[in-house]
Amino acid sequence: AYGRKGPRASWPGYDYLMQAEAGFLSLTGDPDGPPARFGLSMVDFMTGVGLAYALVAGLISARSTGIGQDLDISLFDVALSNMNYLAAWYLNEGEVQRRLPRSAHPSLTPCQLYRTKDGWIFIMCNKEKFWPALCDALNKPEWKEDGKYNNFQGRLTHRDQLTELIDHALSNRPTEDWLKIFAGTVPAAPVNDL
C-alpha cells in the first residue's frame, strides 16, 4: 500500500485509507457535512491502470534491451499523484481546493448539479460558447447580455443567485425532457443509479 521501502512499508492499506490520506475526502461531499469518499474504490482502479502502464513499459524495455525489470507501484503513490492538478494550483497560486455545494466546479459556472422537476441534472458549461446555448435552451435570452452573467468571472461571483435562477428555469420539466432540449448544444447528464 505504501511501497516496499520506508517506515510504512509493512503497514496495511486500502483504497478508502488512501482516499483519506491523499486528500480526496477533503474534496468530496457537501461543504456542511463530513468529508466523503468516492462511491467506488477509485484508488484501486487507478493503481491497476498504473500497473498496466508500467507492465507495458517494462515489456517494451525488455523487448528492446533483453533485460527485465522490477516494477513497483503503491496505492498511496497513485492516490497522491492524482492530486497533481490541485497541488499545482496550490503551489502556484496558494489556492486550497474545498468542497463546494452540488459538486460544483471551483472556477466555472454553471458547472454543477441543478434541480429539475423530477430530480437532478449536471450541466457543465466549461466553455463560453455553452452559456448562450444554455440561455437559449432555457428560453432566457436576456441572461446572455446581463453584465452579471455574460462571462465566467461574473457567473462565478453570482453563482448562488444563478443557481437559484437555473433551478427555477429547470423546475417545470423532467430531466429527460431537458436532455432532449440540450442534446448536442449544452453539455448535460442525468444523475443515474445502477
Question: How would you name each of these model-derived features?
Answer:
Residues 1-121, 125-126:
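Active-site-adjacent "lid/gating" segments in soluble enzymes
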Residues 194:
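Residue-level "edge-of-site" marker
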